[in-house]
From Swiss-Prot:
One Pfam assignment: ATP-synt_ab_N
HAMAP family reported in the protein's UniProt record: ATP_synth_beta_bact
GO CC list: chloroplast thylakoid membrane; mitochondrion; proton-transporting ATP synthase complex
Family that this chain belongs to: Belongs to the ATPase alpha/beta chains family.
Function as written in the Swiss-Prot or TrEMBL entry: Produces ATP from ADP in the presence of a proton gradient across the membrane. The catalytic sites are hosted primarily by the beta subunits.
Protein's UniProt name: ATP synthase subunit beta, chloroplastic
Topology of the protein relative to the lipid bilayer: Peripheral membrane protein
Annotated binding of ATP, by residue: 172-179
Phylogenetic lineage: Eukaryota, Viridiplantae, Streptophyta, Embryophyta, Tracheophyta
GO biological process terms, semicolon-separated: proton motive force-driven mitochondrial ATP synthesis
Reactions performed catalytically: ATP + H2O + 4 H(+)(in) = ADP + phosphate + 5 H(+)(out)
Organism of this sequence: Vitis vinifera (Grape)
Keyword Translocase (UniProt): yes
This protein's record includes keyword Chloroplast: yes
Domain of life of the source: Eukaryota
Length: 498
């Protein structure tokens, strides 16, 4: 059953009339609370502890019920630090799961797991809230038609296209352009699809969250002058927070995204950075609750928890949530249960390559390692599929020849191989593209390239029509017409120098 968004969550005045319990035991972030007989809260209900510690400091801790222990006691996990809590303190049962603000007022703001703004810009101007625990859309509500989600980024749309309402895994180390790629996608969905984005920072560094916020303000993704014109809402539960907060922050971000999809009927991009930290937090909570660990120490409910989150990310007849999830692979072991469980849900993977970034080719998406289940003739059409396969074959052949070139040089290659290398180098450069959000740093205007234009450009390179053009003409341009214009300019410049 779908729960409709409720208006205005429980305020303090209404809280006082709810069930009251008392803390019976505290072990780190886990609280045992005793309630009067017949007044037990439900699983996932939010409990609030209000009071003062021994120094007189105000305490306000929200917890979530995880287990009913019997003898009128429940076990709950705290969403913030439990410092200063004492046995016997009063606990209020709110009578409902955690509810967070949703709607247009969330754009341009930063929230914590409880939906409280943490950016010092005052309260959120909305009375509409929604519970973070909801069932996935019923099968009858789903939009089962397979369609491509056009990003305007050539390398993605041609070689590893995203599915509308699909899940994409983003792999890449530090400093290869993950943040810039994420910001460009946020920018493009707003411009081309009239959509919005929600960014869920799950268990990552606070510094990275702050850097992302600053870069978004600098590039215009967050509009400081008119905050309502921003294109993204940010939800952070960083690695210094208790496991309960890190486990639920993904659901908070997803709930905000669902409102844009179901009520505003928009296309939404949901970023989760990092999905591994969601699993890790679940593992910590599972151990704290005394559950028997499963393989490699993970929680026994790993697949269920992952499925509950992922099944809510989908296309309905109203709109779509397309999710891009950064995946950390512990010790580069792809068989580790956390990444292995994630892979089962992914429709496409975008792999960022340090080698391409070192060459200055941005976006540094690896054209041979990135994959997509959408790249099939019956979905994308014969023309797109054939072009993509020929591009991959050319790049693969170039990769195979690189050792020979390094040892013997280009002159030792056959005529056919030399032609392949020349075209592959043009393709490699043509896969680069100037980004709108990088205009501030590069000075060159960003380009959105439609899928039809992308296919036409690569077909012209593969056909040999552009063999006479210098390869630098293909570097950091939009469509193929810009490359030919750039080649003419380069020719003019070289003539003037002579």
């Amino acid at each position: 059953m779908r729960i409709n968004p409720t208006t205005s969550g429980p305020g303090v005045s209404t809280l006082e009339k709810k069930n009251l319990g008392r803390i019976a035991q505290i072990i780190g972030p886990v609280l045992d609370v005793a309630f009067p007989p017949g007044k037990m809260p439900n699983i996932y209900n939010a409990l609030v502890v209000k009071g003062r510690d021994t120094v007189g400091q105000q305490i306000n801790v929200t917890c979530e019920v995880q287990q009913l222990l019997g003898n009128n006691r429940v076990r709950a996990v705290a969403m913030s630090a439990t410092d200063g809590l004492m046995r016997g303190m009063e606990v209020i049962d709110t009578g409902a799961p955690l509810s967070v603000p949703v709607g247009g007022a969330t754009l341009g703001r930063i929230f914590n797991v409880l939906g409280e703004p943490v950016d010092n810009l005052g309260p959120v101007d909305t009375r509409t809230t929604s519970p973070i625990h909801r069932s996935a859309p019923a099968f009858i509500q789903l939009d089962t038609k397979l369609s491509i989600f056009e990003t305007g980024i050539k390398v993605v749309d041609l070689l590893a296209p995203y599915r509308r309402g699909g899940k994409i895994g983003l792999f890449g180390g530090a400093g290869v352009g993950k943040t810039v790629l994420i910001m460009e996608l946020i920018n493009n969905i707003a411009k081309a699809h009239g959509g919005v984005s929600v960014f869920g920072g799950v268990g990552e560094r606070t510094r990275e969250g702050n850097d992302l916020y600053m870069e978004m303000k600098e590039s215009g993704v967050i509009n400081e002058k008119n905050i309502s014109e921003s294109k993204v809402a940010l939800v952070y539960g960083q690695m210094n927070e208790p496991p309960g907060a890190r486990m639920r922050v993904g659901l908070t971000a997803l709930t905000m995204a669902e409102y844009f999809r179901d009520v505003n009927e928009q296309d939404v991009l949901l970023f989760i950075d990092n999905i591994f930290r969601f699993v890790q937090a679940g593992s910590e909570v599972s151990a704290l609750l005394g559950r028997m660990p499963s393989a490699v120490g993970y929680q026994p409910t790993l697949s269920t928890e992952m499925g509950t989150l992922q099944e809510r990310i989908t296309s309905t007849k109203e709109g779509s949530i397309t999710s891009i999830q950064a995946v950390y692979v512990p010790a580069d072991d792809l068989t580790d249960p956390a990444p292995a469980t994630t892979f089962a849900h992914l429709d496409a993977t975008t792999v960022l390559s340090r080698g391409l970034a070192a060459k200055g080719i941005y976006p540094a998406v690896d054209p041979l390692d990135s994959t997509s289940t959408m790249l099939q003739p019956r979905i994308v059409g014969e023309e797109h599929y054939e072009t993509a396969q020929r591009v991959k074959q050319t790049l693969q052949r170039y990769k195979e020849l690189q050792d020979i070139i390094a040892i013997l040089g280009l002159d030792e290659l056959s005529e056919e191989d030399r032609l392949t290398v020349a075209r592959a180098r043009k393709i490699e450069r043509f896969l680069s593209q100037p980004f709108f959000v990088a205009e501030v740093f590069t000075g060159s205007p960003g380009k959105y390239v439609g899928l039809a234009e992308t296919i036409r450009g690569f077909q012209l390179i593969l056909s040999g029509e552009l063999d006479g053009l210098p390869e630098q003409a293909f570097y950091l341009v939009g469509n193929i017409d810009e490359a030919t214009a750039k080649a003419m300019n380069l020719e003019m410049e070289s003539k003037l120098k002579k």
